[in-house]
Design a protein with these regions (language model features):
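Charged (often Lys/Glu-rich) extended helix/loop segments that serve as interaction or gating elements
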Residues: 1-135
Length: 135
């Protein structure tokens, strides 16, 4: 049997801060476990790609994490990833049908915008939630 959906859906996130330690760099994203629950819920691993290619690789392990102060707000760890800077964008791949359907307003975080790209047409399916819509 095959998949009806396949590898679809990408969560775009911005690097808001990089916290350096001896062997690791914690890449803090603006996306969090409430946006993509699969890694926190059952250890799913999603491919992460930089949106702009620079070529220079980091010598440290990058730990991709969200801004929520929870030990499970972690996406993945990657060695030899391209060097990143604050305000860079990354793509978390293959979030598919479970990305938005498992998302929540945990920690009063609004759900992300949903955009459909069909060929050269780009359409907003659902606008980003506003804080007043949550409360």
């Amino acid at each position: 049997t095959g998949s009806i959906i396949g590898n679809t859906g990408v969560l775009i996130s911005k690097v808001i801060y990089i916290k350096e330690s001896y062997k690791k760099s914690f890449v803090i994203l603006d996306a969090a476990m409430n946006d993509l629950m699969r890694p926190a819920l059952y250890g799913a691993v999603h491919r992460i790609l930089p949106l702009l290619k620079r070529g220079k690789k980091s010598k440290k392990i990058y730990e991709f994490v969200g801004p929520i102060c929870e030990s499970t707000d972690k996406f993945t760890s990657i060695k030899n990833f391209q060097e990143l800077k604050e305000k860079d964008f990354i793509a978390i791949c293959d979030v598919g049908a479970y990305g938005i359907s498992l998302s929540s307003n945990y920690n009063l975080r609004p759900k992300p915008i949903e955009i459909l790209i069909n060929g050269s047409k780009i359409r907003v399916i659902k606008k980003r939630q506003k804080h007043h819509e949550i409360i």
